[in-house]
């Protein structure tokens, strides 16, 4: 098929990884995929590695900026819009698909001005600034979590595209005649509060329920985190970054982590119970809303950072680790919330709009 698709996603892995999953599906269907990003985001590393043409526009966020930056903002946005319009004219896509990040605002408006169908996908339970603005004129609005956007004929609840290897057909039985296995995830850039909290909390557990521990600390935090575990007499494997997440998830019985949208979707895919500590300063507190998706169904416990010290974490760990059937029930519930067809569903929506 001689047709181009322009994907817009940038900044963080939470936007880029779901978009990459869809890019691969577009390619499998014969489309040529182009990517619109910004010079500062993770896309500059990942998209060339994926062999996709990357087009860049210069745009940054405005929240928390000083007065001078706000005064310059209209000129920055106008320049970014002109750059995005040039890319749209060059690529001539049958549709433009936005997955979030600063790039999607100018890119989405450029699609509208060019008369190209625009589809947006929101990964979080609370829509980002750009997607809220674009939703009013997008051809379709895809959401990972139900009711992120107001009900409309163009809304589709699709789930988050995640790597297919993460899906387990049936969650395995936790604590099957062995020690429990605890996976701690601080995010690819780490989460220092978790790096400090978990060693102290685990040190308070009775010896007979001490789990095996695999802790992702984030870049440059592995040595000091490993030292914290040694200082309190807890054995743990600490790594700055976990390359094979499918293997890590299949190993674990319980996960302690933040509540980014992609993490929530991966926990469901892998059928894993979790203790979720939402990032307290996330924009619009979207991580708390993400966490509620699993917690209200009984697949996770939410533990706000402000009220969770070592004693509180130790008490919760003790509760769940001493009740294997509760862990297994949480695992089954998590798996029931997974959307294994999310990637296909999003791409189907795009193809329908492009050729409908």
From Swiss-Prot:
Top-level EC class: transferase
InterPro entries: GlcNAc_MurG (IPR006009), Glyco_trans_28_C (IPR007235), GlycoTrans_28_N (IPR004276)
EC number from the UniProt entry: 2.4.1.227
A Pfam family that the UniProt record links to this protein: Glyco_tran_28_C
Alphabetized UniProt keyword annotations: Cell cycle, Cell division, Cell inner membrane, Cell membrane, Cell shape, Cell wall biogenesis/degradation, Glycosyltransferase, Membrane, Peptidoglycan synthesis, Transferase
Keyword field contains Cell inner membrane: yes
Pathway: Cell wall biogenesis; peptidoglycan biosynthesis
Recorded GO CC terms: plasma membrane
SUPFAM superfamilies: UDP-Glycosyltransferase/glycogen phosphorylase (SSF53756)
Catalytic activity of the protein: di-trans,octa-cis-undecaprenyl diphospho-N-acetyl-alpha-D-muramoyl-L-alanyl-D-glutamyl-meso-2,6-diaminopimeloyl-D-alanyl-D-alanine + UDP-N-acetyl-alpha-D-glucosamine = di-trans,octa-cis-undecaprenyl diphospho-[N-acetyl-alpha-D-glucosaminyl-(1->4)]-N-acetyl-alpha-D-muramoyl-L-alanyl-D-glutamyl-meso-2,6-diaminopimeloyl-D-alanyl-D-alanine + UDP + H(+)
Membrane topology: Peripheral membrane protein
Molecular function per GO: UDP-N-acetyl-D-glucosamine:N-acetylmuramoyl-L-alanyl-D-glutamyl-meso-2,6-diaminopimelyl-D-alanyl-D-alanine-diphosphoundecaprenol 4-beta-N-acetylglucosaminlytransferase activity; undecaprenyldiphospho-muramoylpentapeptide beta-N-acetylglucosaminyltransferase activity
Places the protein is found: Cell inner membrane
Covalent S-S links between cysteines: none
GO biological process: carbohydrate metabolic process; cell division; cell wall organization; lipid glycosylation; peptidoglycan biosynthetic process; regulation of cell shape
Role played: Cell wall formation. Catalyzes the transfer of a GlcNAc subunit on undecaprenyl-pyrophosphoryl-MurNAc-pentapeptide (lipid intermediate I) to form undecaprenyl-pyrophosphoryl-MurNAc-(pentapeptide)GlcNAc (lipid intermediate II).
Family stated for the protein in its record: Belongs to the glycosyltransferase 28 family. MurG subfamily.
NCBIfam families, alphabetized: murG (TIGR01133)
Name recorded for this polypeptide: UDP-N-acetylglucosamine--N-acetylmuramyl-(pentapeptide) pyrophosphoryl-undecaprenol N-acetylglucosamine transferase
Annotated source species: Pseudomonas syringae pv. tomato (strain ATCC BAA-871 / DC3000)
């Amino acid at each position: 098929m001689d047709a181009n698709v322009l994907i817009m996603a940038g900044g963080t892995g939470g936007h880029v990884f779901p978009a990459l999953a869809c890019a691969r599906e577009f390619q499998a269907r014969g489309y040529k995929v182009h990517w619109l990003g910004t010079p500062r985001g993770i896309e500059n590393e990942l998209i060339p590695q994926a062999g996709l043409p990357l087009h860049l526009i210069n745009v940054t966020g405005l929240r928390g900026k000083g007065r001078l930056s706000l005064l310059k903002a209209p000129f920055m946005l106008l320049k970014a819009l002109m750059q995005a319009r040039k890319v749209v004219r060059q690529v001539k896509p049958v549709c433009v698909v936005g997955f979030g990040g600063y790039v999607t605002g100018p890119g989405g408006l450029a699609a509208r001005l060019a008369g190209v169908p625009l589809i947006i996908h929101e990964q979080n339970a609370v829509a980002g600034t750009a997607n809220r603005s674009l939703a009013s004129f997008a051809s379709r609005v895809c959401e990972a979590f139900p009711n992120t956007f107001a009900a409309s004929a163009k809304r589709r609840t699709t789930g988050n595209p995640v790597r297919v290897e993460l899906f387990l057909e049936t969650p395995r039985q936790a604590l099957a005649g062995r020690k429990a296995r605890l996976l701690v995830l601080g995010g690819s850039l780490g989460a220092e509060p978790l790096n400090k909290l978990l060693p102290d909390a685990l040190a308070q557990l009775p010896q007979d329920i001490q789990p095996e521990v695999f802790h992702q600390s984030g870049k440059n935090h592995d040595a000091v985190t490993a030292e914290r575990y040694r200082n309190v007499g807890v054995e743990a494997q600490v790594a700055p970054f976990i390359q094979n997440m499918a293997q890590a998830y299949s190993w674990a019985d319980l996960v302690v982590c933040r509540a980014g949208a992609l993490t929530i979707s991966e926990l469901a895919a892998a059928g894993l119970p979790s203790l979720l500590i939402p990032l307290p300063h996330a924009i619009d507190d979207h991580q708390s809303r993400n966490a509620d998706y699993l917690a209200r169904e009984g697949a996770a416990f939410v533990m706000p950072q402000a009220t969770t010290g070592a004693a509180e974490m130790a008490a919760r760990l003790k509760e769940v680790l001493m009740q294997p059937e509760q862990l297994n029930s949480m695992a089954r519930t998590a798996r029931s919330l997974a959307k294994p067809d999310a990637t296909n569903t999003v791409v189907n929506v795009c193809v329908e709009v492009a050729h409908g």
